[in-house]
Amino acid sequence: MIKNTGHRKLGKTGSHRRAMLNNMATSIILHEQVETTVAKAKEVRRVVDNLVTLAKNGQNLQVKDTLKDKVAYKKLFEVLASRYEKRPGGFTRIYRAGKRPGDNAEVAIIKLVD
């Protein structure tokens, strides 16, 4: 019997998946939007929302484990934590952007909410 694992495997090993999601989360924090596949966008949304919540609560050590970029770390705590101070959750939004020409994969744009 197959049980739900709670996350998408995305065709990658655990360490590769974690590294990819951490890198995508860093890119979203720096650029405030990223274009990727729908499945990856849904997974990285969990990571980014958790990072913003941790930054709002001032838990910087847990954020440092995920964000290796100092500029993204600084922006998260100085800009984004204050921007979303009164917002209880849902810091990202996913827009579907059609199909990718090469492999016909569904593409989405994930953005930080203003």
UniProtKB/Swiss-Prot annotation:
Keyword tags: Ribonucleoprotein, Ribosomal protein
Superkingdom to which the source organism belongs: Bacteria
Keyword Cell membrane tagged: no
An annotated Gene Ontology molecular function: structural constituent of ribosome
GO cellular component annotations of the record: large ribosomal subunit
One Gene Ontology term from the biological process aspect of the record: translation
Assigned protein family: Belongs to the bacterial ribosomal protein bL17 family.
Protein name per the record: Large ribosomal subunit protein bL17
Organism: Elusimicrobium minutum (strain Pei191)
